[in-house]
Amino acid sequence: MRFAVLLALFGLALAARQSSVSEQYYRSGREYRYQFNGHLSAGLPIPGEENSATRIQSLIRIQPENGDFMRLQMTKTRFATSEEDRVLSFENMNEVPVSEKVEKVLSLPIRFSYRHGMVGEIEFSTEEQTWSSNIKKAVVNMLQVNLVKKGMSEKNEYETEHDNDFFLSNERTLEGECEVAYTKIEKSEKEQQWTKSINFEKCSLRPEIVYGRRYAEECNECRERDEKFSSTVFFYNITGTPEEFLINSVELQSKHMFAPVTEQKQLITARITNRLELVYSGEQKEQIEAVRNSDKKENLLYNPEHEIAEEKFAQTGDEKYLRRIPNYVDQGEIIRQQLNRLSKQTEQIELESNHVHARLVKSLRFATEDNLSSIRSLVSQKSEVVQSLYWDALAIAGTKVTVSHLLEKINNKEISPMKASQLMKILAEVRIPSEQIAQELHRFCESDIVSRSAVLRQSCWLSYGSVLNGVCGQTKNVYGSEITETRKQCTRQMKEKYIRELIEKMNQAESRYEKVLFVKAIANAGIDTSVVELEKIIRNQEVEKTVRMQAIDALRRLRLSMPKKIQNVLMPVYRNHKETPGIRISALHMIMQTQPTSGVLDMIVRGLEKERSQQVRVYTWSTLKTLSESENPAEKEIRRRVSQSLASIPVEEQKYLESKHKTFNWFNMQSGATLNWATIFSNDSVLPKEITASLETVFGGEWNKYLAQIGLYQNNLDSVLSKLLQKVEETGLEQLVVRGKRSSSFFRPAEMLRSLVESLRISHRQVPAMSPIAMIYLRYKDQDYAFLPIDIDTLPEMIRRVARDGQLDLSEIEKVLTQAARFTVAGSAFFHETVRKVPSALGMPQVMTSKMPTVAQMNGEVKFDLEPLNSDKFTGLRLRVKAEPHVASTHVCKLELFTPIGGQGIKLLHGGRIQAPIDSEIEINWEKKLIVKATIKSPEQKRHIAHFMTRPVLFSREVTMDKQMRQYPEPREKTIQLRENRFPIHAFERQYFEQTGLKMTVSGHYRRPFTTAFTLGESIMMSSSSLPRMLSLKEVVAYMSFSGFEETEMDEPRLLNRFYEKETELFETEKNVEYEQEDKEPKSSQLQSQIRKVKSEGKAYKHRVHMKIHTVGGPKTQEAECEIRALCDERVRFCRLNLDASRSPIQGESRQWQLKSSAEWLYPEVPSTMKKMLESRREWNAMWTGKWGSEKQNEVTIRVQGEQSSEQKFWMKKAEREQSPLTSGGQASRAAQLNQYNIHATYEVTPETEFWMENVYSMFKTYYFFSAEVQPKQNKENRIQCQITLEPFTRQLFNVTVMSPKEKLVLELENQQTPFRLPAVNIGREFGRVQSVRHVVKAVERQTRPECIVKSKEIQTFDEVFYRTPVMECFSVLAKDCSENPDFAVLMRKVSKRGEEKMWKVISRENVIELEKKSEEMSVRVNGKEISEDKWEDFGISQRGEEKFFIDAEKVTVEFDGFQAKIQMSSLYKNKQCGLCGHYDGEKTNEFRRADNEETDDIEEFSRSYLSKDDECEVDEQEMTNKRNYKVLREETSSSEEISESLIELYSEAFQSREAHHRLGRREDRQVCFSQQAWNKCLKSKDNKTETKNVHFKCLTETTRSPRISSVFSQADISENLSDVEGLPSLAEPSPHSRFLPCVIPSLSLSQ
């Protein structure tokens, strides 16, 4: 609409002229005059709102010459501006007078080649200025029209009619060399209308300059394809023919939209409308002067000379480039003014402080060395805060001049090393890097002052690498010199020189830290030539592993520019099974960052089938799985490729201590963020080798792969952990009696361990000697920002002195911590700054800037005290913090249009200021119980805490082109006032916490439109104020105390005794006689029996947590209190939890709000075998009652009973085949996971609570994850019953049935699984006696211990390799600590040659324990003496059940039933274990290591090496040499295969039990698939109605047990063969027209 009004005004103005147009085509010797009007505006994309506009008007004289040349002159040029919301005529705008010099430059003639409408070379006078030549190019650009279809690249796809024509061609225009689309319409025989459109998405060259995008990567998939951010369209009226023609009028419409945040929000728009109208053609009355000294020749492309001059000055500091910049202002005085203003602003940080600091940065970017030298004395007189902000401004400016000046200040020690280190971080993001700046940094990094400070040295070299990336790396920055110069800023010789210097530094480095530092500097540089040197480091096995892993990571900045090269380097490393898992996983991680092709992915997938390393296999699978589920639009293509490759991989179950990779996505439309989490484990450490968390974002079509990342890397920290734990244990043994007895003087277990090593010639299992190291690193914008190495070389001397003789020296701690520290910290930064310079169709530059200047200051004091003072030990500490932080930040989105009369534009300001005083004290005491007390004092005066605002501003500044200016031209600013009828103002004011005496007022106003989603707040203000002093709040006190493990008598259960009260039928369900036995007594009787048994044990422990918060002062004391009391028996089978809470009444309440609740739960007796689990019901019962409210009370009682579902009991019956009570424990453990929970709730609640409950209930019914089925049903009032059934194997599927008073609701997951295993109650877990925190930690640690199971002739190793070997009458070493100082050994032998009874011996540092079954009784000897049962517990021996005995030797535990045993060992013995239980390192390929630490494939040879022969035993050589006794049964197994096997059995049994209906099945590519629904069987004697249905299949991967899978087909009634159908998750298949009959096991109907 605005364009239409503008064109109408132009038409009226031109119609009023007495034009004389008598020509039909251009002829030499004639003159043609055009009226030129150009309108340039910037504003919000809201029609009818105010804009900042500039108008240029001129009379254009054109005189054709012979030989296809024309002369052009601009005359009567005028300028005008406006800030109105509509387009005005020139006379109604504010005309701006121009100087004679400007008018003279604009009137200089030009000469250009012009043939068939195409513009060639343009000649300018020597006096011509760059800005004026670009304006004249804009006029000439409107005359260019391709009449003869020169360079046509594509013909019209449609039929060409006689009056219509369309074609494409590549054309050089003012705005770039781009594809141009033409359309011609014939109006008459000699009159045509031409339309010309520039396609900016297909440009080979654009004079566009971009800064601040060095770290972003293009995300083509993130952009909306139908959105045009730049468009320019021409409309021509032409008479004549292509050879002889005349342009009567030209209209140009151009638009540029800028989206600084997201492409869905176009916040700022620039519009250009130009028009050329022929007003005269006829005789030349005055010839245009010839172009003087016409050696200055250019093409039609925009000339970025001014922008290049700015770049060159920033890069080199040469002042000659400043003289080429129009409107240059001497910066000396301006910097003085800004510093003085900044001094006033630092007294109270406000939003204006950001603007002052941003202007200071802008001025410094044009400052010369003389300017900075002239203000030395002024800076020295300023406060430390102002000086700190000034140093930051110099670093942010980032020019050669400011960088040199800053480094000089650091060398002169005017800036502290810590502050200098922070400045180096800012220099890493220098806006326009150059070779000169890099050289300055390199010299500084080599200086003495840097070498003396480790922190400064690290920052300097990392920043040097980042600057090199800007100079020689491949970034998205576009510099002006790249548009006009063919020579690149960085040559190959320069790249090789930089990398060679860093490699030499790395090779010369003596410490591991120094080597890692220079590798990280190379990583930051991201130069392509570094790949060769990094490959040498990666492939060199002699290089330390830490350095090699860092070298792999150093390839990350080249992942998209050199993907194939990186894959060629790292794929051999990944596929080399001799490499350590840590190296291989790092290689895989980097390969996946290159977004590999399907061929590379297939290689990785095929390698998984033969992969022996558990860590590598699991990490590879989790990485591929994560990528296949990625929501990041930047990974759309790689997600598709990975999904295809992943289809052939069986699901890999991930254990807790295994490598894995996870992502969490937050995406809306094409923008969002991804949080990545990865853990890498290795076979030489129980601790993770590396833990990383990274954040990547997609905004505005740009992908920031590593916006922020934090990681922890360690190597060989296990040795430190082992020593620490051993030290703690030894210290405790000196103070406490160790299990009652110690070794006698004649019986020395330690000597027995050593003699065992000597007799079997056991070699020490020891990882290669390597000093421990830990390293925490931070990355920002894909650059290594900082890293902290922790090893013996880098620890400060002060920390080394803290530990003396294994004890902490309190005097050293007090000396460091108790000194009160007063501090004043100030800093500033541009957290985000991007600049985009684009030429407009008027030949004037338009600059889009997005930045976020931030200024912060904090004054405060910190004091730390140890209590009590002057004591040998301390029992408490006190921390006092008093500070007042001030932070102000503004996000500025600005579009500025530069013209010969100044600059106009629009900016959006989003600012915030926070001033939050902190005055708090924390006291901690642990003498008798843990007590934490925190006191927070309130402000004594009224304070403004926070202020946020957002507003659009129009601005303009007037400058003169004809002279150098000495003062900064302050812009005139005007806030855009949005129309009230379209954007009404909404004001608000809220008050909070008035009752506490600390009234907080939140007030503000915002504008919200009626019809669109556009929201723009003008000002939103938040403030906090206190009441008058006599009533004001003084402080808030929070208190917490904890006491635990206080021994007491077992109390009578109070709730569970009432579990079946008045509800005798509760939870009684119909039994399935096929696999559930009839109970001899009801559930209620069973529960009472369990309660009596628990109570009879007598001993229990109570725990208490008390929390309270209250106010001091104010009109009334406000408080809230919570007390949690717990009581558990020592085996944690029964627990009671009481929670009491209260708070003071709040607004609308007159009474105190209170909560009183109690919960009890009871575990059944732990079943030792599957048989015992099947003998009777094993239920977990819990009950909770709660009562809460103020005036009105709510009361709820919930009963929960957990049990096995019918399906799980069926599986238990099938699995109950193992005769040994011990070896069926694994199956019993899985079966002990209760998968069905019956919940019964009764309630009496207030209407408000009932309304909330109904909302939650409705949300679940409509949640998109669920498929809901609702059946109206009348049930009892105030009662809800619910049944939750988990799929028992993977626990990633569940069904929920809810019975409310009015309906029955069935919820099922809709064709998907939960991303994690759902928690379930395990009635098989047994912690032993839990009497202290130490016991809790110990019990949890044992849950993750590896286990070795030893049967009569079969052994399952710690790494889950199954093999067969005979057991002799001589002792064999099963498990042993084979380190230099062994802690334990576990041995076993047969008691007799023909019997199966075994004798076990467990040797620890303290005792030798022997167990042997004699006459159905267990004989126990300790240190050679038989001991009675009442003393077993003193030595860690206990009996569990009737047949199992348990030995706890701290580092190792053994369960033994007289025949078979299970050994569990601490994970700290990774790579230190030896014996028949294998070489424990997490891998399955090297289990058979003989006693001399040599690997062998001969199991007999392996077994003999651990056979301890003596005079008391004899080896049966015939049995020993029988080869049939030795065999690897399964080298690897996985729970997924076990699950598949179990499912096969279940499906098989289900098929046999159904005769009325059948399932559909098909087989393909190592998979057997069954339909998830059962269907009525078609009877041949009847006519069947059929319809097409979608059949969902569950596919099981075939393993080595394929015959078992195949047998399902023969057992099941599968009459339909679907082998002719491709592998699709959902198939269309005819089925009988009848209702669905549920499967015999519906909870096992897994979704595909």
Swiss-Prot record:
GO annotations of cellular component type: extracellular region
Gene3D superfamilies (alphabetical): Lipovitellin, beta-sheet shell regions, chain A, Lipovitellin-phosvitin complex, chain A, domain 4, Vitellinogen, superhelical
Swiss-Prot/TrEMBL keywords: Cleavage on pair of basic residues, Disulfide bond, Glycoprotein, Repeat, Secreted, Signal, Storage protein
GO molecular function: lipid transporter activity; nutrient reservoir activity
Signal peptide start-end: 1-15
Name of the protein: Vitellogenin-6
Endoplasmic reticulum as UniProt keyword: no
Post-translational modification (record): The precursor protein is probably further processed into vitellin polypeptides VT2 and VT3.
Gene name per UniProt: vit-6
TM ranges: none
Organism: Oscheius tipulae
